[in-house]
């Protein structure tokens, strides 16, 4: 007899394991299936967490080389990349084991193996020894995430031509690295290896980096990265990538038809991700996909099959771990008969470079396109006492508010701890706050958060320190 569950989650990433825990909290007999062998998905294993570890460690390496100008004399600074990688891996191991403990604590049955639909109520699980079992599910949630995509005709070998996964595991610092794609992931990984000593060239098809970001922020971001030594080749299309004895040659053509060749040791392909739906056997249950191979769902995350749901990177929307987490909680509550929902207007996005970049809500470009009348408030970190005190004052805060109602419509930050500061704006937007609500909230001094308050004051031209 097959074991029966009230709910089964296929995928143990941020969306999947959070969904499974919430389902169990709500009293459902729940199982979670993960093929990787460790929980946490791309984010924890080969994405958010290991990349943040390397971003932090590379920043510390960079800072310590410049301490003498601050009155701290140090000896010769050496990089031990092997130890750095071990530190990164240790953080990942601790966190993945922590997630497994949470499933056990909440009495979620954890299956290690590849889950696929045998029918709308049956799930086939195949482990790494090809042993198969079948379980039954009253409700199934698909949360299998996404995988990196390459360019047509270019094979990623994770040695010379790498994805973000391979870029996290290099065994030596490349002398030259080409990053194909000027999005969040490419710029994060490019900045890591730049700080560790690589000469980094970014090749981008568009005329600006970080597509979808507020263009004023994007422009300032590129200026700062250029000052840090990263070189940009905009409006360049990659034609070929050919391996050579020493690495690879990336051949491009620019908007004027000029051809360029970039020699490098490593090429990082960072041109996006695609839903990970292969091998799920969705057709056996009749689950429909859209033209981009994403699973079609309604507002409750239900597919066209009444008892099959989907969340995270396999459905429409930004491919972000925290978006998947929110959807995981919402779909669990919907399955349990509650009214789970996600406010997609308040999902932040963060680039964890130095300085950090964070955005939430609408950009100026989006508001103009929608013919929304708005007002803007900006405040530079150059006038923020905490930022100046620690000599980390590049960037600014920008708040966008409705011209009539003063309701906060969006915010964009480039500067120290932007990823933390954006949360204040998220709370404000969730509760429909105005820029004046933020401006009249007392912020501790001296803190970076005062820049948010000053930007809010600036919306009505009342900033004190600018």
Where on the chain are the PLM-derived regions?
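A conserved FAD-binding loop/helix module that cradles the flavin
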Residues: 217, 311-366, 445-466
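Beta1/beta-strand and adjacent pyrophosphate-binding region of the FAD-binding site
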Residues: 2-13, 173-183
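Glycine-rich flavin
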Residues: 2-5, 21-173, 206-210, 216-217, ...
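Glycine-rich dinucleotide-binding loop and its adjacent helix/turn
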Residues: 48, 142-199, 203, 231, ...
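FAD-site-proximal beta/loop scaffold in flavoenzymes
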Residues: 157-173, 260-335
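Flexible, glycine-rich terminal cap/loop adjacent to redox cofactors
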Residues: 8-36, 42, 49, 53-60, ...
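Alpha-helical segments flanking ligand/cofactor-binding loops in enzyme cores
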Residues: 21, 191, 222-223, 365
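Short hydrophobic core segments
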Residues: 8-10, 115, 135-145, 180, ...
């Amino acid at each position: 007899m097959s074991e029966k569950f009230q709910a089964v989650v296929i995928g143990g990433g941020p969306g999947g394991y959070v969904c499974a825990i919430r389902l169990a909290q709500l009293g459902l007999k729940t199982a979670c299936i993960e093929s990787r062998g460790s929980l946490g998905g791309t984010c924890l294993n080969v994405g958010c967490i290991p990349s943040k570890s390397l971003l932090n460690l590379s920043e510390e390496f960079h800072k310590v080389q410049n301490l003498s100008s601050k009155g701290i004399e140090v000896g010769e600074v050496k990089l031990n990349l092997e130890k750095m990688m071990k530190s990164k891996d240790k953080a990942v191991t601790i966190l993945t084991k922590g997630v497994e403990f949470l499933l056990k604590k909440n009495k979620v049955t954890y299956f290690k193996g590849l889950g696929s639909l045998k029918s709308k109520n049956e799930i086939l699980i195949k482990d790494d020894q090809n042993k198969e079992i079948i379980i039954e599910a009253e409700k199934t949630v698909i949360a299998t995430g996404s995988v990196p995509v390459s360019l047509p005709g270019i094979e990623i070998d994770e040695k010379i031509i790498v994805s973000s996964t391979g870029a996290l595991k290099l065994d030596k610092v490349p002398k030259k690295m080409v990053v194909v794609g000027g999005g969040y992931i490419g710029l994060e990984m490019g900045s890591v290896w730049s700080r560790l000593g690589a000469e980094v060239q970014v090749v981008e098809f568009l005329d600006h980096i970080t597509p979808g970001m507020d263009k004023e922020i994007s422009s300032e971001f590129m200026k700062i990265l250029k000052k840090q030594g990263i070189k940009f080749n905009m409006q360049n299309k990659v034609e070929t990538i050919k391996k050579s004895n020493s690495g690879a040659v990336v051949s491009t053509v620019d908007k004027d038809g000029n051809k360029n060749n970039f020699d490098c040791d490593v090429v990082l392909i960072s041109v996006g991700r695609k839903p990970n739906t292969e091998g799920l056997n969705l057709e056996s249950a009749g689950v429909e996909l859209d033209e981009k191979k994403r699973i079609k769902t309604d507002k409750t995350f239900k597919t066209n099959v009444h008892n099959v749901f989907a969340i995270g990177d396999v459905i429409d929307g930004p491919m972000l771990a925290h978006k998947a987490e929110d959807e995981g909680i919402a779909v669990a509550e919907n399955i349990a008969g509650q009214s789970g929902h996600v406010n997609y207007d308040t999902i932040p996005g963060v680039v964890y470079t130095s300085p950090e970049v964070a955005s939430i809500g609408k950009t100026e470009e989006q508001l103009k396109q929608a013919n929304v009348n708005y007002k803007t408030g900006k405040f530079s970190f150059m006038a923020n006492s905490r930022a100046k005190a620690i000599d980390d004052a590049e960037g600014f805060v920008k708040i966008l508010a409705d011209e009539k109602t003063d309701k906060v419509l969006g915010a964009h930050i480039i500067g120290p701890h932007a990823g933390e500061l954006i949360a204040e704006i998220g709370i404000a937007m969730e509760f429909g706050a105005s820029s004046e609500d933020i401006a009249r909230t007392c912020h501790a001094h001296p803190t970076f958060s005062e820049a948010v308050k000053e930007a809010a004051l600036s919306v009505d031209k009342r900033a004190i320190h600018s």
